């Protein structure tokens, strides 16, 4: 699984002119599921995201997690994180999971974050979404359960 994690002051997702998920201070997490991903990848990613210390402590040092600051998480599915642009000009998405598997692991990831006590909002799987955010920092982290980066 891959994720782009952004520290935000606020974020929201709009589908068909309706806000379907919104948070204040916390993390916006774009998540992509690969065709070979498993429950273990979900667990690794949920652990990493929930414990990622990218919020500043009283000394201004990045030392606190989203849970430490009582922040919120907005999770948005994004299969295009598996776009392969090494050849040609159009990305290939052959490494992305098929929709049924992608949805199941995406929903499991959200469930695992909630089990860790986090307040989680979501976008809508397979929908065309407009994502609005105020990136705080900016701080943007790339994660990959295959540890490719």
Curated annotation (Swiss-Prot):
One of its GO terms (cellular component) is cytoplasm. Its EC number is 3.1.1.96. It catalyses: glycyl-tRNA(Ala) + H2O = tRNA(Ala) + glycine + H(+); a D-aminoacyl-tRNA + H2O = a tRNA + a D-alpha-amino acid + H(+). SUPFAM superfamilies: DTD-like. It comes from Thermotoga petrophila (strain ATCC BAA-488 / DSM 13995 / JCM 10881 / RKU-1). It comes from the Bacteria. One of its GO terms (biological process) is D-amino acid catabolic process. Homodimer. An aminoacyl-tRNA editing enzyme that deacylates mischarged D-aminoacyl-tRNAs. Also deacylates mischarged glycyl-tRNA(Ala), protecting cells against glycine mischarging by AlaRS. Acts via tRNA-based rather than protein-based catalysis; rejects L-amino acids rather than detecting D-amino acids in the active site. By recycling D-aminoacyl-tRNA to D-amino acids and free tRNA molecules, this enzyme counteracts the toxicity associated with the formation of D-aminoacyl-tRNA entities in vivo and helps enforce protein L-homochirality. Pfam families: Tyr_Deacylase. Keywords: Cytoplasm, Hydrolase, RNA-binding, tRNA-binding. A motif (Gly-cisPro motif, important for rejection of L-amino acids) lies at residues 137-138. GO terms for molecular function: D-tyrosyl-tRNA(Tyr) deacylase activity; Gly-tRNA(Ala) deacylase activity; Ser(Gly)-tRNA(Ala) hydrolase activity; tRNA binding. InterPro entries: Daa-tRNA_deacyls_DTD, DTD-like_sf. This is D-aminoacyl-tRNA deacylase. Its main location: cytoplasm. Coiled coil: none annotated. It is found in: Cytoplasm. Belongs to the DTD family. It is an enzyme of class 3 (hydrolase). A Gly-cisPro motif from one monomer fits into the active site of the other monomer to allow specific chiral rejection of L-amino acids.
